[in-house]
Amino acid sequence: MRGIHPSRLTSLRQARRGGTIPAQIGMTAIAGVALIAATRTVVAGNPSGLLAAGLAFLLVCAVVADRMRQGYPHDRIGGCNVVTLMRAGLVCALLMPFLAGDAGGWAVAAVAGTALILDGLDGYLARRSGLASRFGARFDMEADAALALVLSLHIIAGTAVGIEILVLGATRYVFVLAGMALPWLRADLPHRQWRKVICVIQIAVLILLQVPVLTPDQAIAVARMAALLLAGSFAADIRWLWRHAT
């Protein structure tokens, strides 16, 4: 890594491969599985759903450990990445009621709302502790995308809103797949506060649609308005990437 003293680089490599980072991720994995088990007291679930959620979270932890080993620029994961991992744990916990056939509802909304609130904490902790990184920003984005997808599946299974809700839940993954064919889509985007605002609106709408406070027609209208906002955001990003492609 450029600009890092050789002794510092050696310390980072040791932390990633066999030092503090694997141990910290291991402890966080245990805490996350415990969080998922505790969430089962709030949301519907059965033993097979709990097992699936736990295994999904352990897979997330394994992927995080691998990505950190490849290029994480710090020697500890920090509270910021612990919070993001716990958010991922809550997303995995939401698989339990979905797999149990009890999609949506107030409990699902409460768990998802907690994950949304924590979304503002990990970035703050990263900046305050000096542990901000491209990895952390990407991990935060992927946690948001996973939450949106799982909530969309709940909506399809439990409400009158149809498969069109996947515009809110799967657009990020379509964008990533498109980037595999079009390399210019993988370029870094400039920071835009409106992008974060639209993400919050996206998740908030998906949470709102979990609970029976809107008529079916109102729910569909709200979903479509949020989808238009999200589509506009992605269109603006794609336009910027196209104009700056080399």
Regions found by a protein language model. Give the residues of each.
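Active-site His/Glu-centered metal-binding helix of metallohydrolases
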Residues: 89, 117-125, 138, 142, ...
